Amino acid sequence: MKKIKLYFASPLFTVMEQWFNRDVVEELRNQIGFLPKSEQVDISIYLPQENEAINDKSAYANSTMIAQADTQELLESDIVLAILDGVTVDAGVASEIGVAYAKGIPVIGLYSDSRQGTHGNVKKIEALDEIAESQFAYINLYTAGLVKLNGVITGNITDFVDTILEDVKKLIEDKLEEVE
């Protein structure tokens, strides 16, 4: 059976992050099951927090164990799903995006910070001239650029999920057309 693998790159250290990751991946797994011809392809989503061999924080895994395990999973993936939210992009997520870019693996990013854009309010632009008054969120432009060069950044969870489902539909068709 043909395989499609998605890699979910996200911060995973707080209860909030773990719940968000679990809920999004669970929703994706459910919706992917309803895609046309999905039963003809083995589709999986790797969520690093589910890999207890390296992410059970009460156990021990050193840096090379984590790097090797997650990199192997990432390199076997067809698409990387990257959560870009946070004060800055999580360092692990940024590293995963770099590996994906270097290997030509497409990335679908989610950057949902509500401080994006002016929402038509000119005072937000004027405030940029005042020290410590920026009304806008910050995202590392290098990391964002790597995603955009090899994928797309969405601004809300609905667009994120819809984009993933569309890409998985295309992958299903491509996999089923492959000659063995």
Regions found by a protein language model. Give the residues of each.
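Conserved catalytic or regulatory cores that recognize and/or transform ribose-phosphate-containing ligands
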Residues: 1-180
